[in-house]
Amino acid sequence: MAEENQVENSEAAQQSPEFAIQRIYTKDVSFETPNSPAVFQLDWKPEIQLDLDTRSTKLADNTYEVVLSVTVTATVEDKTAFLAEVQQAGIFTIGNLPEAQLAHTIGAFCPTTLFPYARETVASLVNRGSFPQFNLTPVNFEGLYASYVQQRATQENVAQSSETH
C-alpha cells in the first residue's frame, strides 16, 4: 500500500504544473539623446510614445526564453528628446500545462514578471540622461494577451470564411 501511494504521488508530481524563473537579464539596452544639448533649453512638455513587444524561443523541453522589448520615445516641440530601448529577458521553466495555458503563461505572465526590471532600467537611463524623473505606468499584459488572442481568432475566422467563398 505504501508503494501504491508513492506511485500515485510521483504521478501527481509529474502532472502538476511547473513554473520557475531560471534567470532574468538585460539582453540589450540603448539610450539616445539626438538633440542634446539644445533639447534641455526647451519647455519640458514631452509627448511620450511607448512601444511594447514580446517574443519567445523554446530553448529545450520545458525551457523558454521570453524577451520583453520596451521602447520609449520622448518628443518635445517635434524634436526627439530621448529614445530609450530595453530588451529585458528571462529564462523560464514551464511544464505540464495545456497548450493554451502555456501560451498564456509565455504571452502574459512572463512579460508581467519582466516588466518591473525593464521599467527600472528605463527610469535609470532617463535619469542618467539628466531628464526629469520618468516612470512607466504598469501594463496590463493579461488584457493585451486577451486582445491578441481575440484578434487572431477573428483573423482566422475571416480567413476561413474567405476560403469557403
UniProtKB/Swiss-Prot annotation:
Localization terms from the record: Cytoplasm
UniProt record, GO biological process: protein folding; protein tetramerization; protein transport
Disulfide bond sites: none
InterPro entries (alphabetical): SecB, SecB-like_sf
Superkingdom, taxonomy of origin: Bacteria
A single GO cellular-component term on record: cytoplasm
Gene3D superfamilies for the chain: SecB-like
One Gene Ontology term of the molecular function aspect: unfolded protein binding
Keyword terms of this UniProt record: Chaperone, Cytoplasm, Protein transport, Translocation, Transport
Classification via SUPFAM superfamilies: SecB-like
Signal peptide (from-to): none
Protein's job: One of the proteins required for the normal export of preproteins out of the cell cytoplasm. It is a molecular chaperone that binds to a subset of precursor proteins, maintaining them in a translocation-competent state. It also specifically binds to its receptor SecA.
Family (UniProt): Belongs to the SecB family.
Subunit structure and binding partners: Homotetramer, a dimer of dimers. One homotetramer interacts with 1 SecA dimer.
NCBIfam families: PRK05751.1-4 (NF004393), secB (TIGR00809)
Name of the protein in question: Protein-export protein SecB
Taxonomic source organism: Colwellia psychrerythraea (strain 34H / ATCC BAA-681) (Vibrio psychroerythus)
Gene: secB
